[in-house]
Amino acid sequence: MSKRRYLTGKEVQAMMQAVCYGATGARDYCLILLAYRHGMRISELLDLHYQDLDLNEGRINIRRLKNGFSTVHPLRFDERKAVERWTLERANWKGADRTDAIFISRRGSRLSRQQAYRIIRDAGIEAGTVTQTHPHMLRHACGYELAERGADTRLIQDYLGHRNIRHTVRYTASNAARFAGLWERNNLINEKLKREEV
């Protein structure tokens, strides 16, 4: 079994596809999507309430734990659609009107950590991920994906709510793409300096 501690973007997509057609598919898909895209810890995810969302403006308020910085993130179009789909289905669940928590169980109570863990673990198994999947891997997947896309370390730090940049550096340190073009850029500078000397 691999020691990798994060999921790739493709693995997360496979997990979302694996859950989307089950009896709780709308909820599970939305849960995995938001956890991944916003790099949420499981407690932050399960503490989300409808008052934290503004679907019209496309924003989500992330209340970070562990003394992290809380932030407002943009909600992308597919995230809004996933929340809307889940909200429509959720309204038909027994006891759904008793709580404002976004993610609830079939009994209408807020989803527990154990239930969320099981959903994510089972989605990983169903998707055939190369490593045993748990909720925090979605947070790491977010950080690594942002680094892979060229996001600055400080921006990733803010996005994930890290107080200490040491926790963020792991994502950018292993990203070889950050060195792409380094020699070409330096060559251009050297060429410019040579032309100015002449």
Predicted regions and their residues:
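Conserved catalytic core of the tyrosine transesterase superfamily
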Residues: 1-198
